A protein has these predicted regions:
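Short acidic active-site motifs
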Residues: 93-95, 115-116
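Catalytic binding pocket for nucleotide-activated donors in carbohydrate/polymer assembly enzymes
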Residues: 100, 104, 108-193
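Hydrophobic (often cysteine-bearing) scaffold residues that line and stabilize catalytic clefts
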Residues: 41, 69, 98, 136, ...
Length: 228
């Protein structure tokens, strides 16, 4: 069964009022495979948690995290973020339902995180990403722009990443406006439409540029064989 779990999300402040005994944390999803969790990323999340004016909980949904790998990963994350929720690899519908319990997501860096971004925005979650100098760090920002998410959510440094996440965590109205924007748009159509023929055109141009060099190289090789 590959049907998507529908998004059902009550406004945060409404849920917060119902839970009066203790502050309701803003749940922040981290969707990524195991290899993308690294010390710089965890330290940045810890700084966000330290600075936040509201309770926040990072919820890790880790692809391929099972058995001893999950135990090791949970220990490593809890060493930096003691209150984090660390989940094992789960079936897709359970994963989507879990994302529905969150308010936003953060993309790990410095690697691109296309699958995690797609999973989160399909469930109506806005997020924050870090665009760096490497080619592999640009894809998240490209997806954000395609979805018309605010440029402020595409950070270019650690401090900007922290500030953008704090704003999304603390400003409930802004965050929920972005949630509705994503839910009201055809996210899958936006993400997967494109012009694949442009890639073929570029490859064709490169090939055409190399043809004269290949021909010249062939002539030189033929001449050398004849002279020998």
């Amino acid at each position: 069964d590959v049907r998507r779990v529908p998004v059902t999300r009550t406004p945060f402040l409404t849920r917060q009022q119902a839970q009066w005994r203790e502050p309701l944390p803003v749940r922040v999803a981290v969707c990524a495979s195991v290899m993308k969790i690294n010390p710089n990323f965890l330290a940045t999340l810890a700084e966000i948690e330290r600075r936040s004016r509201v309770a926040v909980r990072f919820c890790f949904y880790m692809g391929f995290a099972q058995g001893l790998t999950l135990d090791y990963l949970r220990n490593a994350i809890h060493a930096v973020l003691p209150g984090a929720e660390v989940n094992a690899h789960m079936p897709v519908q359970a994963y989507q339902s879990a994302l529905n319990s969150c308010e936003l997501f953060v993309s790990p860096f410095p690697y691109g995180n296309m699958n995690g971004v797609v999973d989160a925005v399909r469930q109506g979650l806005p997020g924050v990403c870090l665009s760096g100098p490497e080619v592999h760090s640009h894809i998240d920002g490209g997806l954000f722009r395609r979805l018309r998410l605010p440029e402020a959510l595409i950070a270019t440094g650690y401090e900007a990443y922290i500030r953008a996440t704090l704003r999304l965590v603390e400003e409930h109205d802004w965050r929920e406006m972005l949630q509705h924007q994503l839910q009201d748009s055809d996210v899958e159509q936006v993400l997967f439409e494109g012009h694949p023929e442009k890639f073929a055109d570029v490859i064709s141009d490169v090939w055409q540029q190399h043809l004269p060099f290949d021909a010249a190289s062939e002539r030189v090789g033929t001449s050398q064989r004849l002279s020998s």
